[in-house]
Amino acid sequence: MRELVILMLITVALAWCADHVAFGPVNPNRRHRLIFCTLLIIILLAGFAGLRTHCNDTGAYRHSYELITESSWDTTDKSVGANPLFNWINYQLKMHGVSTQNFLMFWAFLTVGCYIIFVRGYSANYPLTIFLLFTTGCYTFAFAGIKQAAAIGIA
C-alpha cells in the first residue's frame, strides 16, 4: 500500500507540474510540458500496473494466457459476449512470443494510457483529477478486471 501512496503523490506532483511549472524558457504554449508530464505519468502508472505479479484476478488472467496455443483461436467462442477481440489480441500476443508479464504490461499501457488521455482532455484541474483517479479506485480497478478496464478505457 505504501508503494501505491508514493506513486499517487509522484503522479499528482507531475500533474501539478504539467499545469504550473515551465521547463526551459517561459513559453505561453505550455503544450510541451503537458505532453512530457502526461507521458511520464502514463509510464509510471502503466509500469506499476504492468509489473504486478498478483492482484485480484491477475492469476486467472496469467493462467488463461499461458494456456493459449496455436490451435486455441480455432476453438474459441467468437460470440460478442465471449469478448472475441480481447481473445484475438491475446492470441496474437502469444503467437508473437510475448511473455506473460509483457501481456500484463501491454494491457496496462493500453488501459492507463486511455484513462489518462481521457481525464486530461476533460479535466479543469489535472492534479485533482489524478488524485481522484486513485482515491475512487479507478486506477486499481484496471488491476482487477483487465477486459472490463480496457473496454472502459477504449470506449
Task: List where the protein language model places each region.
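Start-transfer (signal-anchor) and selected internal transmembrane alpha helices
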Residues: 1-45
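Transmembrane-helix signature of polytopic, membrane-embedded enzymes
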Residues: 116-136
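Extracytoplasmic loop-helix module adjacent to an early transmembrane segment
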Residues: 36, 49-72
